[in-house]
Amino acid sequence: MITRRQFGQMGLAASALGLCPPRVRAADWQSVLDEANGQTVWWHAWGGDPKINDFIEWLGAEAEVRHGVTINHVKLASTADAVARVLAEQQAGQTEEGAVDLIWINGENFAAMKDKGLLYGPFATELPNWPLVDVAGKPAVVTDFTLPTEGYESPWAMAQLVFEYDTARLPTPPATLAALKDWITAHPGRFTYPQPPDYLGLTFLKQVLYGVMADPTRLQQPVGEGYTADTAPLWAFLDQIHPALWRQSRAFPENEPALGQLLADAETDISLSFNPGRASAEIAAGNLAPTVRTFVLQGGTIGNASFVAIPFNASHRAAAQVVANLLLEPEIQARAQDPNILGFQTVLNLAALPEEDQNAFAGLDLGVATLSPQALGPVLLEPHASWMVKIAEDWQARYGLSK
């Protein structure tokens, strides 16, 4: 059942944000809870990070205790695998009893599912905890790679690109993209990025695009006729740095954990992360040197939100909605922000929370390597999803796949 505390949070949030009361009536949500009790959510989510896997396992225990919902984490190498599964079911005429109940998603995968009618909803704006979401202060929670979410996915974490470095080996990191290029070419083998189409590798390419394009505002529009001219400076930049990358760019790390391990092993001096708290979490776990810190480039770095979405033919829609709402609980958001757990940034409007929840966030030690919100600087909006798709294709055509 809905607790008094939940309704207190909803009322306070609505008042603080100037919103109407949540559209979910108690009876409506109670019927969702009743239906969800005893269901198993098959959550298809990236499984490449042990810390995230542990968090999902912990969340499953919470869902079981609070709502009688079991979470089965289907660990993905690529979100596209889950999208392909749902698409295949749609093409086969399977409109019910789908294999996927919930997907960790954003960007081009959300765009593809929304375009093909593969999503259930809108549901996110109907969740009891939705009024706690910082829609005004964090527009990325309702706009995914320029595409309005329209309630078809629910946010659960914020991310922003940061660079990690070891102060013992690099006292002063480069502050601009041009300075980074100069540093890379002057220090052969000490930098690399994950191999596209890995999301972090593509994020690095998009960050470079922001810095070298004549008119970066074009990134907010779908790829057009000017694409070749727009991206020419990107390929020129990569052509300059690739000979100086780790292993002379004959191989690339597979993903963010593999990239971070290179920094941990002192094989590289500068790394990347899409989680500003990752370095602090790894230091706390003893996996990174205590001298590691983070920095961002002048002018800002790319940021976005992570979401969960429910396929149109999900077998357990009620339980999936319960998990989506649970992810927005303040105490769970605070746990995710703890650098000892994940170090993710919250999607909530902290000013709208009850004092006890505000204190929980305020009491978090974000870690020695985590930049303050002010130091993180401006967030650059994700480009339209079509840029990500086209750049990944062209990167492979130009540089091939490492073996």
Please describe what each predicted stretch is.
Residues 46-58, 73-81, 96-257:
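Extracytoplasmic ligand-binding site segments that recognize negatively charged/polar headgroups
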Residues 29-37, 44, 49-70, 163:
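Short, polar/charged alpha-helical segment
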Residues 82, 110, 259-260, 320, ...:
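Short, hydrophobic alpha-helical packing/hinge segments within bilobed ligand-binding/sensory domains
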Residues 261, 368-403:
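Conserved C-terminal helix/tail region of periplasmic/extracytoplasmic solute-binding proteins
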Residues 6-25:
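N-terminal export signals
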Residues 1, 19-39:
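C-terminal segment of N-terminal export signals and the immediately downstream linker at the start
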Residues 246-309, 313, 359:
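Extracytoplasmic/periplasmic substrate-binding proteins
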Residues 301, 306-375:
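Mature extracytoplasmic/periplasmic domains
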